[in-house]
């Protein structure tokens, strides 16, 4: 799986493998990026812990791509926007606003395996937002590894059997 990705995890504490809030599906054909990021935050934190600034900035920084007709947002979220958002979240965590850290990975850094940063984040209770290629680029949320299988939440729709992704580690 070669794609852009970044992981989000709480800084310095072990997380119970229990989702903190329900995950959401996309509201449109274009908002898989912000929906995946918001789901990552929702998965890791209780509602009361999530500052409004995080929600606002995720929506503000995403949906930055223009369609071929010049309509803003109708081509989703760029990798540059996700990188910027990842860096912003990391900085937000460093100043103590939310116990979160984030790292943007690209190119050869993005792989699944025993020594990968993705697996490390998932094993430590974090999540990863990953850009996959179905028919088009699409962001999804990885929430863990269970019985050697990667746990993936596709916020677009429920996966049909032919689209189910299982990765055995």
Which positions does each model-derived feature cover?
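Conserved, non-catalytic sequence blocks in retroelement Pol enzymes and Pol-derived host proteins
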Residues: 26-27
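Short, well-structured active-site flanking segments
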Residues: 45-57
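A broad structural signal for alpha-helix termini and local helix breaks/kinks
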Residues: 44-45, 90
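Short, conserved active-site loops that position catalytic residues or coordinate cofactors/metal ions
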Residues: 36, 56-61
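Active-site-proximal loop/helix segment associated with metal-binding centers of metalloenzymes
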Residues: 32
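Buried hydrophobic packing segments
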Residues: 36-44
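Conserved active-site-adjacent core of cysteine acyl-enzyme catalytic domains
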Residues: 2-21, 62-169
């Amino acid at each position: 799986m070669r794609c852009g990705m970044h992981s989000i995890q709480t800084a310095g504490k072990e997380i119970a493998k229990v989702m903190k809030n329900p995950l959401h599906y996309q509201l449109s054909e274009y908002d898989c990026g912000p929906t995946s990021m918001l789901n990552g935050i929702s998965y890791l934190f209780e509602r009361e812990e999530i500052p409004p600034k995080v929600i606002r900035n995720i929506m503000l920084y995403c949906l930055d791509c223009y369609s071929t007709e010049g309509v803003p947002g109708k081509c989703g979220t760029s990798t540059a926007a996700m990188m910027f958002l990842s860096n912003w979240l990391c900085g937000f965590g460093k100043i103590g606003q939310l116990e979160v850290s984030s790292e943007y990975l690209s190119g050869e850094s993005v792989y699944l395996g025993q020594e990968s940063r993705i697996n490390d984040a998932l094993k430590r209770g974090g999540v990863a937002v990953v850009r996959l290629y179905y028919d088009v680029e699409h962001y999804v949320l990885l929430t863990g590894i269970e019985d050697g299988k990667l746990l993936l939440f596709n916020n677009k729709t429920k996966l049909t059997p032919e689209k189910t992704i299982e990765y055995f580690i």
